[in-house]
């Protein structure tokens, strides 16, 4: 018979194991509840990383109801249209639209797969040619197709204040105003006589530039505008494009004008929210030959021409070996202002193309019921700022060159009484980008070597600058201008967006003199020359206290009403007039002889100078 104490060891060894199993089960249940609560109640933006991409992008844990909420709350944007406006002497009348529909995507599925493969290939950043030829798509969107990507863009919790022209959408109104402003050279006194009708100040929705994920999505739209598709010649000529301008007629004299994906012009990629209440236009930037910070494309020649027009002091006249892009250069550091302004306003230039691009979009989406925002990178960012100021649209630019000089040359309308700090234009840049900072100039600069005269540094409205030189120890390099670098290595590397401050006082091309055809005198007073001092005056008023100037004589005669006063005044006038030179302007004196240190020792007239020289 077993003793009672003999069973105690068996009981004591089993009881702790049972407790351990119960503890593990309780912990597992608690962790499950915590995980469910985290998924259920944590905001969607934290789970989604800032933009919705479907189940493949980390949102498979969300239920179908939450996914539907994200797609219908108006913050999810998809590519719906691509607009093309031709430029150049032959193509500037071309206006086309490509609708990115489900049927179109299915018909071009093979090309889309090839495009996805291109942007996932690795690039050796030590080889500049490989970097230049690379497809510049952000690593944050690796594996996502630019044509089907969905982006999250949030509105700011506080609306922006705007004051816009009432007739801005009336056909030909803005064109006639800009033409008149050009004819009067932006004279405020004359422009104010027009008495333009402005809307009262009111609030409009604006993008939340303080939200990092919204800034990333806007930068992605700017990057999306660089997409090259389709790329083969056969595809370029397919009739998927809709002509939104004059009817397209084949031109036998210009066979390079094809109906389809045009090689020459300006593109705008239009993203639309799921509720169709907000539209974002991404304007394509520079495709630069030899400019590493941009992307390779067919529009290189026109991009370069418009860059040099918008961001140089005078038609890209940097040195005597440069070929200017217009005929406005006169002589050293002297330029024809009227000529410059007319060149910028030409129909085949990018500013007019951007206006037409916006007008074509506004035909599809009524601006009175739809919020239209514009964005772009580099040249596209500057154009977004210009069209935003023209029509009063919120604009977000990335790494754009200084566009203040172009704004003044175009004489864009300025809303009266609206403080500058309320302007809805934001320029995002970094201190290691030489183009944004305005230092990509000089003989040894990369821009100069590639043939770009990027001489402007002043921006309008707000500047939001990432100080990567101080914070990360970066050096100024043209590679830091790439939109791929901006998204992956700068915006996503910071937890917050930089503060947006107003542009401090700034002036471009301060050492240039700009002339006008109707100038009666020099724009600036001539500097004194010690080798050519002024000749002494022929009237010595100090020795003749009774003499009066002609103006004084007229004023005295007007005050004198008595006959005696009139006769006495007339008796003095002849003596005064006899002391004045007969024709002082016809035969001015000049220096005839100088001392060895430059002082004039003898004055005389031109005839006397000829006599002295002949002797």
UniProtKB/Swiss-Prot annotation:
One of its GO terms (cellular component) is vacuolar lumen. Its EC number is 3.1.1.3. Residues 44-615 are lumenal. Residues 525-536 have a biased composition (Pro residues). It is a single-pass type II membrane protein. Residues 538-559 have a biased composition (Polar residues). Glycans are attached at residues 253, 276, 360, 551. Residues 1-22 are cytoplasmic. The chain crosses the membrane at residues 23-43. InterPro entries: AB_hydrolase_fold (IPR029058), ATG15_Lipase (IPR050805), Fungal_lipase-type (IPR002921). It is an enzyme of class 3 (hydrolase). Keywords: Autophagy, Endosome, Glycoprotein, Hydrolase, Lipid degradation, Lipid metabolism, Membrane, Signal-anchor, Transmembrane, Transmembrane helix. The keyword Lipid metabolism applies. PROSITE patterns: LIPASE_SER (PS00120). The keyword Hydrolase applies. Residues 520-559 are annotated as: Disordered. It catalyses: a triacylglycerol + H2O = a diacylglycerol + a fatty acid + H(+). One of its GO terms (molecular function) is triacylglycerol lipase activity. The active site is at residue 378. Belongs to the AB hydrolase superfamily. Lipase family. This is Putative lipase ATG15. It comes from Debaryomyces hansenii (strain ATCC 36239 / CBS 767 / BCRC 21394 / JCM 1990 / NBRC 0083 / IGC 2968).
């Amino acid at each position: 018979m077993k003793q009672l104490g003999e069973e105690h060891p068996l009981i004591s060894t089993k009881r702790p194991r049972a407790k351990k199993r119960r503890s593990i089960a309780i912990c597992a249940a608690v962790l499950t509840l915590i995980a469910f609560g985290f998924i259920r109640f944590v905001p969607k933006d934290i789970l989604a990383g800032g933009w919705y991409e479907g189940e493949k992008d980390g949102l498979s844990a969300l239920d179908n109801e939450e996914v539907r909420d994200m797609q219908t709350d108006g913050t999810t944007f998809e590519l719906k249209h691509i607009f093309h406006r031709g430029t150049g002497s032959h193509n500037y009348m071309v206006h086309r639209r490509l609708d990115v529909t489900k049927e179109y995507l299915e018909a071009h599925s093979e090309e889309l797969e090839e495009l996805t493969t291109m942007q996932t290939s690795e690039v050796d950043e030590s080889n500049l040619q490989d970097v230049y030829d690379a497809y510049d798509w952000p690593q944050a969107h690796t594996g996502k197709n630019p044509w089907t990507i969905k982006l999250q863009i949030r509105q700011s919790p506080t609306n922006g204040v705007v004051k816009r022209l009432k007739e801005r959408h009336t056909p030909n109104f803005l064109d006639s105003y800009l033409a008149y402003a050009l004819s009067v050279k932006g004279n405020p006194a004359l422009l104010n006589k027009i008495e333009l009708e402005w809307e009262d100040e009111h609030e409009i929705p604006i993008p939340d530039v303080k939200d990092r994920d919204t800034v990333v999505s806007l930068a992605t739209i700017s990057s999306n505008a660089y997409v090259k598709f389709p790329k083969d010649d056969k595809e370029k000529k397919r009739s998927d494009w809709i002509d939104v301008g004059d009817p397209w007629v084949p031109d036998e004299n210009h066979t390079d004008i094809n109906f389809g994906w045009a090689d020459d012009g300006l593109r705008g990629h239009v993203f639309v929210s799921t509720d169709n209440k907000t539209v974002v236009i991404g304007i394509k930037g520079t495709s630069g030959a030899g400019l590493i910070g941009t992307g390779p494309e067919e529009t290189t020649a026109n991009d370069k021409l418009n860059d040099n027009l918008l961001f140089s002091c005078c038609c890209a006249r940097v040195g005597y070996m440069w070929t200017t892009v217009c005929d406005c250069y006169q002589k050293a550091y002297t330029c024809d202002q009227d000529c410059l302004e007319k060149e910028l306003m030409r129909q085949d230039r990018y500013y007019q193309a951007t206006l037409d691009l916006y007008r074509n979009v506004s035909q599809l989406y009524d601006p009175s019921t739809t919020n239209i925002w514009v964005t772009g990178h580099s040249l596209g960012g500057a154009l977004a700022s210009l069209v935003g100021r023209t029509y009063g649209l919120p604009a977000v630019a990335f790494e754009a060159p200084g566009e203040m000089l172009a704004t003044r040359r175009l004489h864009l309308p300025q809303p009266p009484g609206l403080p500058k700090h309320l302007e809805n234009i934001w320029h995002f840049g970094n201190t290691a980008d030489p183009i944004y900072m305005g230092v990509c100039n000089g003989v040894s600069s990369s821009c100069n070597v590639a043939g770009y005269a990027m001489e402007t540094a002043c921006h309008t409205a707000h500047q939001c600058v990432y100080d990567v030189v101080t914070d990360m120890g970066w050096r100024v390099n043209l590679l830091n201008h790439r939109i791929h670098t901006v998204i992956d290595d700068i915006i996503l590397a910071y937890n917050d967006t930089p503060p947006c401050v107003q542009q401090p006082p700034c002036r471009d091309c301060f050492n240039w003199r700009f002339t006008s055809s109707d100038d009666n005198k020099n724009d600036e007073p001539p500097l004194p020359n010690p080798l050519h001092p002024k000749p002494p005056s022929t009237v010595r008023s100090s020795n003749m206290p009774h003499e009066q100037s002609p103006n004084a004589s007229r004023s005295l005669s007007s005050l004198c009403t008595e006959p005696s006063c009139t006769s006495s005044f007339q008796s003095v006038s002849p003596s005064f007039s006899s002391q004045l030179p007969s024709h002082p302007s016809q035969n001015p004196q000049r220096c005839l002889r100088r001392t060895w240190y430059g002082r004039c020792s003898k004055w005389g007239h031109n005839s006397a100078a000829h006599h002295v020289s002949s002797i």
